[in-house]
Structures are given as structure tokens and as C-alpha cells.
């Protein structure tokens, strides 16, 4: 049986490992200026926001995310508009490498991952090949294509 102190130390150690991995990923992706993702939010609904994502000016996919709100509600609010660095790291939740947005004010762990509606996101961006007012569709292939393009650009940078 582990003592509470050992559990705290183990948790702290795991947190430090994650921070170290993020810092390594951030450093390896510095000065990668050949990639610009631009999200144009064009449909704002009470519970979700839909938009169009382009890579270097070329349409890539549609995005579903939480609603844009004047005040953040945990797990129900889209990230603020802004410029963010993106890295690809292992997601503990999804058990695979996914894009991660860094330095999003008042948010942590903002990923780009598959899903269809705001019920599948807690601030994250959900890609899809098609959409309607309820969300995005063909999310898995759209996400996989997007990850390949991001990875290629980061590796070429």
C-alpha cells in the first residue's frame, strides 16, 4: 500500500516529466515559421462555434469548438482569438500524438482531436471534412490529414 506522501511524490514526478517533454517539444519546434493555421469562426451558436481552418491560406477543414463567451465557463468556452504556437506531443488522454496549442491564456491542454459536437470538446478544436449547424463530420480522417500536414511543416521548418 502506497502512502499519501509517495503518491504525492509520484504525481509531482509525473507532472515534471510532462513539463520536460513539453519544453523539449517546444524547443524542437522553435523557429518553424513555415506553418500558419488560421481559424475563421463564421457560425456562432449558443452552444458551439463553427469555423473554417486554413493552412498557409489554403482551406484544410472545418472546425467545431465550444461557444465563444464573454466570460469563461470551464469546459464550455472556446479559446480566445490569438496566435498560438503548436507542437505535437503524446496525449495521455487519447494515447496518441496530437497537436497541442501552447500558451493559451487561462487554458491548458488545448488539443486538436477528432469529435463531432461541442459535447466532445472541453475547449479543444475538432476538425471535420463537412459540417452543418450541429457540428462537423468525417472528423477522424480530417484530424489525421491535419496532423500529417502539421508534422510535415514542423519537420521541414
Task: Report each predicted region and the residues it spans.
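Cell wall/extracellular polymer interaction/catalysis modules
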Residues: 22-157
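Short, Lys/Arg-enriched N-terminal segments with co-localized hydrophobic residues
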Residues: 2, 7-30
Amino acid at each position: 500500500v502506497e502512502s499519501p506522501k509517495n503518491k504525492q511524490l509520484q504525481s509531482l514526478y509525473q507532472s515534471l516529466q510532462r513539463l520536460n517533454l513539453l519544453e523539449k517539444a517546444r524547443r524542437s519546434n522553435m523557429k518553424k515559421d513555415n506553418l500558419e493555421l488560421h481559424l475563421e469562426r463564421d457560425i456562432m451558436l449558443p452552444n458551439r462555434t463553427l469555423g473554417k481552418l486554413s493552412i498557409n491560406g489554403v482551406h484544410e477543414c472545418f472546425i467545431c469548438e465550444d461557444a465563444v463567451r464573454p466570460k469563461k465557463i470551464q469546459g464550455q468556452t472556446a479559446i480566445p482569438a490569438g496566435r498560438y504556437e503548436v507542437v505535437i506531443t503524446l496525449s495521455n488522454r487519447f494515447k496518441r500524438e496530437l497537436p497541442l496549442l501552447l500558451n493559451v491564456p487561462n487554458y491548458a491542454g488545448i488539443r486538436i482531436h477528432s469529435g463531432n459536437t461541442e459535447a466532445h470538446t472541453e475547449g479543444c478544436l475538432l476538425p471535420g471534412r463537412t459540417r452543418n449547424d450541429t457540428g462537423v463530420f468525417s472528423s477522424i480522417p480530417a484530424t489525421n490529414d491535419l496532423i500529417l500536414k502539421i508534422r510535415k511543416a514542423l519537420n521541414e521548418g
